[in-house]
A protein has these predicted regions:
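N-terminal auxiliary segments of SAM/dcSAM-dependent transferases
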Residues: 1-79
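SAM-dependent Rossmann-like transferase core, predominantly class I methyltransferases
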Residues: 63-128
């Protein structure tokens, strides 16, 4: 595990984000590969003299971020996982990444059919 000061890490993070990309994708990378969640990072940021413990070094994390930016590859493919509802799913480039809108559709269907007494079965066909 790599130990780095919060101050040094925040400087590195700002430099990475200045290359492009969006904050949620970068946070996803840090959580999945770096081993630090955005909420933990926010707490650590309150005290720049503290240290952050990462699963991977900054050079590796930066190279994954560069791949994301240069190849326009979804961060979920590079991390090898994605989240859908309460599931953590393994993904590769051979599968489609679940869309956030699908979670919303499931919530709407559950709300409509929640009061039905009969047991209902649904299938999402993942037609892309």
């Amino acid at each position: 595990m790599l130990c780095i000061s919060v101050e040094e890490f925040l400087f590195w993070k700002k430099k990475q984000l200045s290359k492009g990309g969006d904050q949620p994708s970068f946070d996803f990378l840090l959580d999945c590969i770096g081993g630090i969640s955005s909420s933990d990072l926010n707490l650590k940021s309150l005290n720049p003299n503290e240290d952050i413990h990462l699963k991977k070094n900054l050079e590796f994390l930066g190279s994954v971020w560069d791949d994301h930016l240069l190849k326009s590859c979804p961060i979920q493919y590079l991390c090898g996982i994605t989240f859908w509802r309460d599931l953590k799913l393994k993904v590769t480039k051979k599968v489609l990444i679940p869309r956030p809108e699908t979670e919303l559709i499931v919530d709407i269907v559950f709300n409509i059919f929640r009061k039905k007494s009969e047991k209902l079965f649904f299938a999402e066909l993942g037609t892309g």
